[in-house]
């Protein structure tokens, strides 16, 4: 019996389809993200939400993401930073939120961390939420006329990051 003629494919080649990756749908992407979120520590999950909050189109969306981050990880300092910017209606309101952020950041990093890494904070990504909260706190204190307290926080920030990456000296 004669063989079937091949399609117009040069001899020795294989069809392309088996080499292509399997197509995935939106449902697969969501399932992968869900599995990834479950595998992350609560602190990482919360920070992922904060990363979205920084990019949110509205203050309301940013605040909702920050609140969700706090439900997952109550010591998420950046959540308080987002809320201070998104929800505070006065310097007093922002002050309270920044104080919570500073406290949360200190608990997350731990006292030994401060002693060990003093002078090198800015170079360590995990310190940035704390540094942002403390700078926000200093700015609020200054705005409220509590200059001496503000300066104390600024001096502490400069001890942690002497290169003044936050522009404390010029703020």
Where are each of the predicted segments found?
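N-terminal alpha-helical interaction modules that lie
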Residues: 1-117, 134, 141-163, 170-171
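Extended HEAT/HEAT-like alpha-solenoid repeat tracts in very large eukaryotic scaffold/adaptor proteins
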Residues: 122-139
């Amino acid at each position: 019996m004669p063989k079937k003629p091949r399609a117009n494919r040069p001899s020795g080649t294989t069809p392309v389809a088996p080499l292509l990756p399997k197509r995935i749908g939106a449902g697969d992407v969501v399932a992968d993200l869900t599995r990834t979120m479950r595998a992350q520590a609560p602190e990482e999950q919360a920070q992922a939400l904060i990363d979205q909050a920084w990019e949110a189109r509205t203050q309301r969306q940013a605040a909702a993401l920050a609140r969700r981050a706090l439900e997952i990880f109550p010591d998420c300092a950046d959540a308080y930073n987002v809320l201070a910017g998104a929800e505070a209606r006065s310097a007093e309101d922002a002050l309270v939120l920044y104080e919570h952020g500073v406290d949360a950041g200190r608990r997350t990093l731990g006292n030994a961390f401060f002693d060990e890494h003093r002078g090198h904070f800015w170079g360590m990504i995990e310190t940035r939420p704390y540094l942002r909260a403390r700078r926000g706190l200093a700015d609020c204190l200054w705005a409220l006329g509590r200059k001496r307290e503000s300066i104390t926080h600024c001096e502490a920030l400069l001890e942690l990051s002497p290169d003044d990456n936050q522009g404390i000296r010029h703020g």
